[in-house]
């Protein structure tokens, strides 16, 4: 249970190390994360921190949410995200506290969650990397079909989870153990090594890695 940040995917670029190696990175804008509520065991049954990100016009905020934000003294945001954390860490925060990229450090591993780019209705070749049928030699109008999807009268049904055509993309995806290559504290940017789910401008959630990989030979 760790505090994270809400961000916006700016795009991809590359940076160079002192040795001249090129590293592909994704730029994440994590500016203006502010605490809107501290949840405790006594009041809510668990400990968590609610964070707002971005800005939203007052006319686009519902009255219950406007009252909630006014109580916290925080401007309305595009997203409200909740992070469950330890009670000791929650005690260090208060409503209106701005959380920035200094929450992380260069070289730290993080998990990034976002919504993947939607691909629409896709066939099994694009969706699951199925092989095509033969181009000729007896193949008539069955070049890109998935083939049989079931069996005979017994069991007489299609098993759940059968890979078939359908909607592709637009799923919540979490990429684990991405390394923070660089931090721009002035512009509140995180440069994360590798690719991050979603299109440019998409919202992402950055948290410390849950499953850290062991390094071979480390004592």
Curated annotation (Swiss-Prot):
Keywords: Methylation, Ribonucleoprotein, Ribosomal protein, RNA-binding, rRNA-binding. Residues 134-153 are annotated as: Disordered. GO terms for cellular component: cytosolic large ribosomal subunit. SUPFAM superfamilies: Translation proteins. One of its GO terms (biological process) is translation. Signal peptide: none annotated. InterPro entries: Ribosomal_uL3 (IPR000597), Ribosomal_uL3_bac/org-type (IPR019927), Ribosomal_uL3_CS (IPR019926), Transl_B-barrel_sf (IPR009000). It comes from the Bacteria. The keyword Ribosomal protein applies. Methylated by PrmB. Belongs to the universal ribosomal protein uL3 family. HAMAP family: Ribosomal_uL3_B. Part of the 50S ribosomal subunit. Forms a cluster with proteins L14 and L19. This is Large ribosomal subunit protein uL3. It comes from Paraburkholderia xenovorans (strain LB400). The lineage of its organism: Bacteria, Pseudomonadati, Pseudomonadota, Betaproteobacteria, Burkholderiales. The gene is rplC.
